[in-house]
């Protein structure tokens, strides 16, 4: 076995080199531009999500046989979750498999108004047409499942956005805002879908913000040390940090990956770092994706984010400062332990005996 002191020495040397490079990168950056989120605003904030809730049913057996169960809902009071079951992994020869997937997607398009309206608004004739659904969806169950989940989520966001636009047109003086749990992109569709997607939501005249719970950007040591060096965490109250991407471009960072840019074909937003949590010394920041059509208007952006901060939770779920609308809609669609128990028992009673025996043989 290699001498422990030698291992320690090698690791220490590499860590020292990495730390030196990180500090040099931080020293080359200008101070962050901090904007306090203290604007007056009255917002009607709504969120919408789609989640695959079938992964835990029957100990994951449904997932193993290729069945996805999606729950789709918005945070609006009277909007109950809607379920979609889909066979994402038909064990068939390649040509038959493709035909089955096409037939099921055609059926979804013809029977579901939510999906049909979104597909029509995007200018698609088929869900699986070229330059929309990736070829990997025919060979990979996770790829098809992820594509469908995002399709349903964006369709729901569009439906809610249209309703909010109608309310805005009444002239109530209350600004509607849409929230998405994630970046502003259709990440599991073909490249190029996001530009028309951004144009569609821009046409609604209802701002949309992407707020992922976690971000690779905020875990980057350069960003963490940069914020610490200039006392950002010690600031009191909600705040936003605008990012001068040219500084990071000079460091060799790929802007599209970390921040988004106006030429991006894979998303239609750009990051700002935002803390909704009002407590000083809080490190609970979010990388908020702000649409390209909004981020150039700093005053409007600050008004919207100030309103979101006013309606953010101070609890620890999932992190302090998480917007209440997103928490509310997640609570709607996630199956509690009691609901899982009731649903599993209901399925046991309703499926034909031969199907139950089949699932039981798989470990049900």
Language model regions located:
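Long, contiguous domain-sized segments
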Residues: 1-46, 53, 58, 85, ...
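A generic, well-ordered mixed alpha/beta core segment in the N-terminal half of proteins
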Residues: 69-100
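An N-terminal structural lobe/cap that precedes and organizes the functional/catalytic core
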Residues: 40-81
């Amino acid at each position: 076995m290699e001498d422990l002191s030698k291992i320690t020495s090698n690791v220490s040397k590499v860590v020292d080199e990495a730390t030196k490079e990180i500090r040099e990168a931080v020293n080359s950056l200008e101070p962050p531009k901090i904007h306090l989120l203290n604007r007056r605003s009255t917002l009607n904030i709504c969120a919408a999500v789609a989640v695959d809730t079938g992964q835990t049913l029957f100990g994951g057996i449904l997932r193993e046989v290729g069945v996805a169960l999606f729950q789709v809902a918005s945070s609006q009071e009277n909007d109950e979750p809607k379920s979609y079951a889909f066979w994402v992994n038909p064990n068939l020869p390649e040509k038959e498999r493709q035909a089955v997937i096409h037939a099921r997607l055609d059926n979804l398009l013809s029977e579901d108004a939510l999906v049909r309206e979104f597909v029509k608004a995007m200018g698609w004739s088929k869900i699986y047409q070229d330059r929309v659904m990736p070829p990997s969806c025919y060979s990979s169950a996770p790829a098809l499942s992820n594509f469908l989940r995002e399709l349903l989520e964006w369709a729901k966001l569009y439906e809610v956005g249209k309703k909010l636009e109608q309310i805005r047109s009444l002239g109530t003086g209350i600004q509607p805002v849409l929230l998405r749990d994630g970046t502003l992109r259709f990440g599991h569709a073909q490249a190029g879908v996001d530009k028309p997607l951004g144009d569609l939501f821009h046409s609604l005249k209802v701002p949309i913000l992407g707020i992922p719970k976690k971000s690779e950007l905020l875990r980057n040591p350069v960003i963490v040390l940069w914020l610490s060096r200039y006392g950002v965490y010690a600031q009191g109250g909600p705040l936003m940090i605008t990012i001068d991407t040219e500084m990071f471009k000079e460091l060799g960072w790929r802007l599209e990956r970390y921040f988004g840019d106006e030429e991006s074909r894979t998303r239609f937003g750009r990051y700002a770092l935002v803390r909704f949590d009002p407590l000083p010394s809080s490190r609970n920041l979010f990388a908020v994706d702000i649409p390209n059509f909004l981020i150039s208007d700093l005053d409007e952006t600050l008004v919207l984010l100030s309103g979101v901060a006013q309606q953010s939770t101070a609890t620890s779920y999932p992190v302090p400062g998480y917007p209440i609308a997103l928490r509310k809609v997640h609570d709607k669609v996630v199956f509690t332990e009691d609901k899982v128990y009731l649903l599993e028992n209901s399925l046991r009673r309703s499926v034909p005996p031969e199907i139950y025996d089949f699932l039981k043989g798989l470990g049900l």
